[in-house]
Swiss-Prot record:
Entry-linked InterPro entries: MFS, MFS_dom, MFS_trans_sf, MFS_Transporters, Polyol_permease-like
Gene Ontology cellular component terms for the protein in this record: plasma membrane
Side of membrane Cytoplasmic, spans: 1-7, 73-80, 129-141, 194-237, 285-295, 345-360, 405-425
Name of the protein described by the UniProt record: D-arabinitol transporter
Length: 425
């Protein structure tokens, strides 16, 4: 299969409109991220109940993320994206009308959970399109751009737009506006990705062989030690991102006196920073080595900036300027894990879809575990207990990285691994 090599700073131009579709769709999906937990609490539910809704959402997202890579290879990335697009729109409407509209907690969990199954099909299937349409030694920067447009959508526009719309049309009006963005993103993807190159060998498999390949997305975790360790590091990667979106609105708004709009703007600055850091770390990963960037900048950087995100606002109180410092730091270092997306398919070059499914599963599990940790620890240790737990896990990830061996294009095996890795005893 021929690959189009035209690019701009690592951005594959043949997939440009696909990247734009991701940004627009995730803008709509991101509207709720930084205020929904607070809004559910305002409907009369406890912080733990609000966090559990996100936990269930994350569990559904993890399941969907797990199958998305293989399904995208079997039925093509575009068809998988369209399934996710339709599911998202249908269950978003049901969530708003029957869940939030009637303050019915059971229906909130049901429809929000099912909707959580939808967005990974749209989002992560595009990674399969990237992997099969760019050279492997450019994969890190191409996926860096993927996470950059993801950040533009879910974080920057997804946070800034609600900060201006909520004072005028309220939370529910803002959530209805999200539907328009997701509809637009889905249509852009449908039109622009019709002619992308996708592998054909999976589409000719028998039904039994297709299920066997789908199962490989799970079996890789115990047949390939490097995949297992990389999965654990990827799960830890975004704990603070998903966890802080749940617990920090309550700290900033209810405890420190920030308005909802101010908090949303702080959160948007975090995501705005990741636009540039995703691209930067993707490129640096190709220059310095994938695992070196992940270990020394991702793990250590996130451990320190997660602590700062709690202690600096606690020390300075209602200071918008000081709150931006840890937000920017968090945005810089969370993106240093970007090279992991290139590590997974490099570890299983003959089963890239299954490897990407494990990567996607790990991202989804992070979405699930981050609020789950908050649900367990918040009643006993308050916000600081959750922050310390996340920090400790980043330190664990630092040590796990030392055992991951991967051949990186452009690096000798010795250069890429020997100095950073230790043999299991």
């Amino acid at each position: 299969m021929s690959i189009n090599n035209k690019q701009w700073l690592g951005l594959p131009l043949n997939l440009l409109w696909g990247y734009i579709a991701i940004a627009v769709f995730m803008t709509g999906d991101g509207f709720e991220l930084a205020f929904l937990s607070h809004y559910i609490k305002a409907l009369g539910f406890s912080p733990a109940e609000a966090s559990f809704a996100f936990t269930l959402y994350g569990l559904a997202a993890a399941l969907s993320a797990w199958i998305s890579g293989v399904v995208a290879e079997i039925i093509t990335p575009l068809k998988t994206m369209m399934i996710g697009f339709v599911l998202w729109c249908v269950f978003h409407v049901l969530f708003l009308v029957f869940g939030l509209g009637h303050a019915n907690y059971a229906l909130i969990l049901l429809f929000y959970g099912i909707r959580g199954f939808a967005y990974p099909l749209f989002l992560y299937s595009f990674i399969v399109a990237i992997v099969h349409n760019v050279k492997s030694d450019n994969a890190s920067s191409a996926i860096g751009w993927f996470w950059a447009v993801y950040s533009i959508g879910i974080g920057v526009f997804g946070s800034y737009i609600p900060s201006f719309t909520i004072p005028h049309i309220g939370e529910m009006g803002t959530l209805w506006l999200a539907l328009a963005f997701c509809l637009t993103g889905g249509v852009i993807a449908l039109v622009s990705l019709r002619h992308i190159q996708t592998p054909q060998h999976m589409q000719n498999l028998t039904t039994r062989e297709k299920f066997s390949e789908l199962g490989r997305a799970a079996t890789l975790l115990y047949t390939n030690r490097n995949i297992l360790l990389s999965s654990m590091v990827r799960i830890i990667n975004t704990l603070s991102l998903f966890g802080f979106a749940v617990i920090m609105p309550m700290m900033f708004v209810d405890e420190l006196g920030f308005s909802t709009s101010e908090w949303l703007q702080v959160w948007a600055v975090f995501f705005f920073t990741t636009i540039f850091s995703n691209v930067l770390w993707g490129i640096l990963g190709e220059k310095l080595g994938w695992m070196k960037v992940v270990r020394w900048f991702g793990c250590i950087g996130m451990a320190l900036s997660s602590l700062a995100f709690y202690y600096i606002p606690q020390h300075f109180g209602h200071s918008f300027a000081m709150a931006l410092i840890p937000a920017i730091a968090l945005g810089i270092f969370v993106a240093a894990f970007v090279p992991l997306a290139a590590v997974f398919p490099a570890l299983e070059p003959k089963h890239k879809g299954a490897a990407i499914s494990v990567y996607n599963l790990s991202a989804g599990m992070s979405n699930f575990l981050a609020p789950a940790i908050a649900v367990v620890l918040l009643p006993f240790f308050s916000t600081i207990g959750v922050v310390i737990a996340y920090t400790a896990l980043y330190v664990v990830a630092f040590f796990l990285c030392a055992f991951i061996r991967v051949e990186q294009p452009g690096f000798s095996h010795k250069e890429a691994t020997a100095r950073e890795q230790v043999e299991f005893s």
